[in-house]
């Protein structure tokens, strides 16, 4: 039986989660809510994507103001501002992906339950909802948990890598830098940004230092690393694909070749499909459309000595993350 999902917020992640869902045999997308766009514009935004290309799987057309057709399959569209008013139950949506970026608080996301949803997956970090990273701690999920966070794209990249390093060699402490592509909140030209002055500068013309909670969040999904990692970001003028640089001090001395071998082994076994491994001379665009959370770049890393190492891992911060949202729903359904 297919898992029926709804999506609240049809932005970058909402639209890509929809693509993943529509490409999955075990998932049925039944409803989308976005109060700011019409069904006609929703169709256009879904069909054409500057990064991931044109949608060609099914013909997409508007049936009426509240229904889209993917081939002959109807999709119900709402235009509701308040989550508690979304009629998810009527549409048959059991799992709701909260991808507006607004309702990341557990209590605010809980409003979807009032509309008939059974479970809510927040596609962003949350201050108080339990966070799960597929491949790292999803087995901690219990069926009585109704609201979860899929953490951030960067945490999804860093956590599997940190898990392997910590399991095999032990991490004493580490600093992470993510070189991160442009996202929707960035400015096209210099503009007001009172909370983050640098973040208000033109994204296409600058390398912008920024804060990120991604490294600290690893401590939430891997308690053994709580307090051992922190990090920052450089926002750069690329539209998709980002890269994590983790510099760590190890408890157990290891050569860089031993570290590579450990990561390669896990990428082929317990973390297959989540953690990748490459020895090719790759650059960022080589990972557009890569569904894995984290692809370790064996040639990019370096060790100073047996206990001090820098490891580098790529991620499609849009497509990889959207695939994990669906994977998390699959896992939740298997537990329920």
UniProtKB/Swiss-Prot annotation:
Give the principal location in a single coarse category: cytoplasm
Site features described as Activates thiol group during catalysis, chain residue numbers: 180
Cited SMART domains: Gp_dh_N
Record localization: Cytoplasm
What residues sit in the active site? 153
| Reaction catalysed by this enzyme | D-glyceraldehyde 3-phosphate + phosphate + NAD(+) = (2R)-3-phospho-glyceroyl phosphate + NADH + H(+)
Superkingdom, taxonomy of origin: Eukaryota
> What pathway does the annotation place this protein in?
Carbohydrate degradation; glycolysis; pyruvate from D-glyceraldehyde 3-phosphate: step 1/5
GO BP annotations of the record are: glucose metabolic process; glycolytic process
* Leader peptide range in chain numbering: none
Q: Can you list the GO cellular component terms from the UniProt entry?
A: cytosol
- Binding site residues for D-glyceraldehyde 3-phosphate: 152-154, 183, 212-213, 235
Keywords (alphabetical) are: Cytoplasm, Glycolysis, NAD, Oxidoreductase
**Where, in this chain's numbering, is NAD(+) bound?**
12-13, 34, 81, 317
Q: What EC number(s) does the entry state? A: 1.2.1.12
List, alphabetically, the InterPro entries matched: GlycerAld/Erythrose_P_DH, GlycerAld_3-P_DH_AS, GlycerAld_3-P_DH_cat, GlycerAld_3-P_DH_NAD(P)-bd, Glyceraldehyde-3-P_DH_1, NAD(P)-bd_dom_sf
Q: Does the keyword Lipoprotein apply?
A: no
Name the enzyme's class: oxidoreductase
MF terms (GO), sorted A to Z: glyceraldehyde-3-phosphate dehydrogenase (NAD+) (phosphorylating) activity; NAD binding; NADP binding
Its subunit composition reads: Homotetramer.
Task: List, alphabetically, the PANTHER family matched.
Answer: GLYCERALDEHYDE 3-PHOSPHATE DEHYDROGENASE, GLYCERALDEHYDE-3-PHOSPHATE DEHYDROGENASE
Misc. comment: Plants contain two types of GAPDH: cytosolic forms which participate in glycolysis and chloroplast forms which participate in photosynthesis. All the forms are encoded by distinct genes.
Functional note = Key enzyme in glycolysis that catalyzes the first step of the pathway by converting D-glyceraldehyde 3-phosphate (G3P) into 3-phospho-D-glyceroyl phosphate. Essential for the maintenance of cellular ATP levels and carbohydrate metabolism.
Stated family: Belongs to the glyceraldehyde-3-phosphate dehydrogenase family.
**Protein name (database record):** Glyceraldehyde-3-phosphate dehydrogenase, cytosolic
Task: Give the species this sequence originates from.
Answer: Petroselinum crispum
- Gene name of the record: GAPC
């Amino acid at each position: 039986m297919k898992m029926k999902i709804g999506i609240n917020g049809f932005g970058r992640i909402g639209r890509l989660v929809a693509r993943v869902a529509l490409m999955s045999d075990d998932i049925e997308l039944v409803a989308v809510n976005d109060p700011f766009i019409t069904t006609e514009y929703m169709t256009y935004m879904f069909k054409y994507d500057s990064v991931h290309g044109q949608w060609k799987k099914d013909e997409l057309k508007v049936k009426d103001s509240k229904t889209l057709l993917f081939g002959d399959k109807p999709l119900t569209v709402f235009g509701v501002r308040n989550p508690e008013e979304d009629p998810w139950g009527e549409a048959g949506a059991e799992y709701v992906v909260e991808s507006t970026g607004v309702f990341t608080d557990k209590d605010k996301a809980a409003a979807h339950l009032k509309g008939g949803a059974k479970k809510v997956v927040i596609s962003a970090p949350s201050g108080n909802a339990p966070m799960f990273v597929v491949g790292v701690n999803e087995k901690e999920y219990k069926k009585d948990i109704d609201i979860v966070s899929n953490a951030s794209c960067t945490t999804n990249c860093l956590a599997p890598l940190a898990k392997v390093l910590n399991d095999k060699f032990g991490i004493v402490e580490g600093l992470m830098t993510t070189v991160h592509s442009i996202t929707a909140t960035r400015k096209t030209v210099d503009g007001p940004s009172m909370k983050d002055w640098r973040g208000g500068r033109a994204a296409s013309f600058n390398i912008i230092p920024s804060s990120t909670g991604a490294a600290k969040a690893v401590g939430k999904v891997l308690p053994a690393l709580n307090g051992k990692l922190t990090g920052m970001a450089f926002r750069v003028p690329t539209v998709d694909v980002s890269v994590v640089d983790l510099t760590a001090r190890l408890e157990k001395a290891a050569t860089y070749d031993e570290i590579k071998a450990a990561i390669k082994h896990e990428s082929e076994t317990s973390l297959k499909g989540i953690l990748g491994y490459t020895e090719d001379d790759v650059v960022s665009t080589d990972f557009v459309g890569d569904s894995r959370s984290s692809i370790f770049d064996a040639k990019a890393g370096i060790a100073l000595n047996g206990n001090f190492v820098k490891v580098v891992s790529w991620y499609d911060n849009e497509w990889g993350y959207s695939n994990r949202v669906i994977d998390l729903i699959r896992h939740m359904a298997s537990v329920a």
